[in-house]
Amino acid sequence: MTNDTDTMPIADYLAQGGKLTSPENVPPRYRGELLRLMSSFVDSELAGSAGFAGAINWAPGIKARIAASRITLEKADHAERVLDLMEGFGTDKALYERAHDWAAREGRDSTLEAKRHGGDMRLSVFHYPLTGWTDAVVMNVLMGLATQHAVGELARCSYQPLAEVLRDILPREKRHMELGLEGLERIGATDEARASVAYWMPRVAETFGPAVSERFEKQRAMGLRHTDNETLRSAWRAEAESVLSPLGLC
């Protein structure tokens, strides 16, 4: 389905659940918000992949090494799929990939607000470094659960090509979380695991954004978002606690 500006204003069309299907029929303000969402996803996947690459050599066995390698590879692939969509809006893909040091991190004890830092659009959680295998596994589980909610939200967006790509990506992102959970079950309720949960829970929670957000309201009016930040965060927190509690980690 495409917009038909001859029959109704684009804002009304989107408010009624209309879908846009190509860069050519996207109005300027919509384009800006859409590119912001896509850039945040691409940058977060690239930063996540680059940061998790180091975990491959921390893996305690062959299966764990394969799992870490798979996560690293597929997150980069997910970034490329959405970056391919951005090319249609004039983004120089080759230049974009080289624009930032995706493995760069701040200090472990840095205090970062949820807003963007540096030149890229990664979520703030991807500015913090991993310290070892247990820490990487805990972060992967918590962020993997968050991704199910956040990307699941965007998979319903009004820009149909992005929604379709994200629906294809979601099962693999879920599998990444499941691989992490398998690793966490093997690690068990150690002091190190509990410390990592305490460290990452508030930082992952911040990725959903402020409880009251003018940007969310703007994106909801465009059909790019549907569920508010606090509702998504609460759903994630409840699911995270249900996963961690049987393991003695919350």
Segments from the language model and where they lie:
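Conserved alpha-helical segments that form or flank metal/cofactor-binding pockets of metalloenzymes
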Residues: 2-10, 71-112, 180-185
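Alpha-helical scaffold segments that form or flank carboxylate-/histidine-based iron centers
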Residues: 30-41, 60-78, 132-136, 161-174
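Inter-helical turn/loop segments and adjacent helix faces that build the functional surface
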Residues: 54-66, 149-168, 182-195, 215, ...
